[in-house]
Amino acid sequence: MDIDPYKEFGATVELLSFLPSDFFPSVRDLLDTASALYREALESPEHCSPHHTALRQAILCWGDVTNLATWVGTNLDDPASRDLVVNYVNTNMGLKIRQLLWFHISCLTFGRETVLEYLVSFGVWIRTPPAYRPPNAPILSTLPETTVVRRRDRGRSPRRRTPSPRRRRSQSPRRRRSQSRESQC
């Protein structure tokens, strides 16, 4: 089965794979962040959002994986085998959990659309040859500000809505002309 845990959220495993593995904070840091920001919602019996549900599942899954790794580590006599198991869990499963936790915490913090915009921006940036791209990668925390700025630029500020006296004078002949044209029709 080809299951993509991000599909229902508008992302894909491939989209997250553009972010380097060292981009994601440690599982411990992500768990602390989730707890600090969303503990009440995560522990609540009420359904909050699909992101909260996914976070709960990822946290429970990580707990089970670490319990299994601890059990295997305790019951394996061969230190080399123990190290292989611990390294495998930390490298492969740890990265997947870090990606999941980061994605859902970021969606709850910044909004899903902003996170998706960031993933696409980063994907474009990383695939662009270094000679043709800006030196710095996009930063997720700045995207909401950028989006807000863009929205402000589309609308007019209250000051611009009130024309200056000079502009009023220049507009009045146009108004008269258009009024006279309307009266002619």
Curated annotation (Swiss-Prot):
Region (RNA binding): 179-185
Post-translational modification: Phosphorylated by host SRPK1, SRPK2, and maybe protein kinase C or GAPDH. Phosphorylation is critical for pregenomic RNA packaging. Protein kinase C phosphorylation is stimulated by HBx protein and may play a role in transport of the viral genome to the nucleus at the late step during the viral replication cycle.
Sequence repeats (start-end): 157-163, 164-171, 172-179
Region: 3 X 8 AA repeats of S-P-R-R-R-[PR]-S-Q, residue numbers: 157-179
UniProt xrefs under HAMAP family: HBV_HBEAG (MF_04076)
Gene expressing this chain: C
Purpose of the protein: Self assembles to form an icosahedral capsid. Most capsids appear to be large particles with an icosahedral symmetry of T=4 and consist of 240 copies of capsid protein, though a fraction forms smaller T=3 particles consisting of 180 capsid proteins. Entering capsids are transported along microtubules to the nucleus. Phosphorylation of the capsid is thought to induce exposure of nuclear localization signal in the C-terminal portion of the capsid protein that allows binding to the nuclear pore complex via the importin (karyopherin-) alpha and beta.
Gene Ontology molecular function terms on file: DNA binding; RNA binding; structural molecule activity
GO biological process, alphabetically ordered: microtubule-dependent intracellular transport of viral material towards nucleus; symbiont entry into host cell; viral penetration into host nucleus
Segments of skewed composition (Basic residues): 149-178
Residue numbers carrying Phosphoserine: S157, S164, S172
Name of this chain's protein: Capsid protein
Superkingdom, natural source: Viruses
Annotated motif Bipartite nuclear localization signal, positions: 160-177
Entry's family note: Belongs to the orthohepadnavirus core antigen family.
Listed transmembrane segments: none
Pfam family, one: Hepatitis_core
